Amino acid sequence: MRTLLLTACAVSSILAGTAPAIAADVSPPAARMQEAGARLKALYEAETDAGMARYGIVKRADGEYSPAVRHESVDPASQQERLTYVRGLLRQLDAIPLDDLSAEDRINAAVFRTNLEHALIDGQFRQWEMPFNSDSSFWTYLDQPGSLRTAEEYRAYIARMRDTPRYFDQHLANMRDGLARGFSVPRVTLEGREASITNFITDTAEANAFYAAFRQMPTTIPAEEQARLRAEASAVINEAVIPAYKTLLAFYLNEYQPRARTALAARDMPDGVAYYESQVRKYTTLELSGEEIHQIGLSEVARIQAEMRQTMADAGFQGSFDEFLHFLRTDPQFYAKTPDELMMVSAWVAKRADGQIGKLIGALPRRRFTIIPVPDALAPFYTAGRGGLESCQMNTYDLPSRPLYNIPALTLHECAPGHSFQMALAEEQADGPAFRRHTYFSGYGEGWGLYTEWLGVEMGIYRTPYENFGRLSYEMWRAARLVIDTGVHLKGWSREQAIDYLAGHTALSRHEVETEVDRYISWPGQALSYKLGELTIRRLRGEAEAALGENFDPRPFHDEILALGAVPLTTLEEHMRAYIARGGKPVVAAQGVVAPSQT
């Protein structure tokens, strides 16, 4: 392991050394390039169709896909069948000469390969035996089918609801297998989280969240058909959905929680050290060891803490750092009195950002998003916010734990120019393969989200020292994750040790701190992706500014990153260095609405 120096240069050099070379940007003969591209396209289109088939989706003659009519099969036999199929795809992918592919197809191949390798990682450790954590689960969001427009789509949704007992039973059987070998979510992160199940156990079907889509149906569906669909939905919710959730609740409380592992560290599970290192690679898409990441985290924590102390001085606060944190956590001026007040602050930040984004990004998405509260069933144990293609969620649960000085950074990250913005641009890349539009890598996506918080400084979003401290507190939060995640899973930190570290370095509330730490404990490796992704993007920008000098323009630089879409960070590094070598000329054509030039 190379020696690590706790300086920004060391952090940069560690990250800079991780990208393997992708084939040189030299076009092969046209015939070879066409043949290799066709072979690659056949592979990823076959995988797309196979993925659709797992949900009963079929491609119609017009090229459109039918709606899903079932949940995927997750039993061990289906999992092994899937792994055999993935290994076969990898063998075929290996047989395609990389040098024969076009520059665009080399990116497609890198993304496709990484997707397949991640599937093999999950298979190697039988990840299906632990299908949830304190943040995400297989039983949530099934009640949100998206926009249903036709009777066929409603019938497909009803069919999926009818399939819920089978789907849950397979997951429960897998979880029993995991319990038997000590592969489970830690018990301490399970306590009190059954509300995400009990909220779906209602006295009537009409009161159930699964029925929400039927309350107001499109007028293009005849009234008689609407009545039939509502009656069928009510019957299925009563006969299939509610009983499935009752079975799940009994299993969760009486079987899973009492038998879940008491050790926190991933290293203490079967083949635990190898498992943790695999999760690090999967979520960061970098070849860094846990120890290297721990040292990067310590370096970043020290750097950010110095900036936080300067910002405290800018605010004119007289007292110690701990006293300043106490002031921020307890003074009423920093907290909303109603959920609507918090939502309005977020919406106001989003609109202010709208007026500035065009100065930094050239191609803007056509799709709009809305800002909504996190659903009540999830809010108590959910993160502060969550960005999505159609909506950006803000958590309004326990308002005394949601300081308003954090909302500007949170809104930029989750809404625009962060997740909702980036996802919309990815969706609008109509010329690329379908699998690219729906691929998500945490290192890229979360790295971009955290980077946009930093862009808020250039955009003039942070108007007070407190809002800037909120930004720094959020950056510190992500840097501390590098220390805590590796501390828990490789070094054996206790939950209390992790809580004390996060609380002592950020202005996060106690509720947020505990929720976050439980997330890191139950979801090894995922939290590392944010800071490592952001460091990669900021380092690439520094390289571009140094190489291009006065010719550097942030708009095409950011357009190039966003037009590329979600890719492994190693691929992003290679691609953006090609962009720099071309003098800042686009390698990928950006799509979207072109923002007017601004000075």
Model-found features: residue ranges?
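Signal peptide processing junction and immediate N-terminal pro/mature segment
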Residues: 15-25
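Positively charged n-region of N-terminal signal peptides that target proteins for export
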Residues: 1-4
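N-terminal maturation segment of proteins
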Residues: 23-599
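Bacterial N-terminal signal peptides
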Residues: 7-16
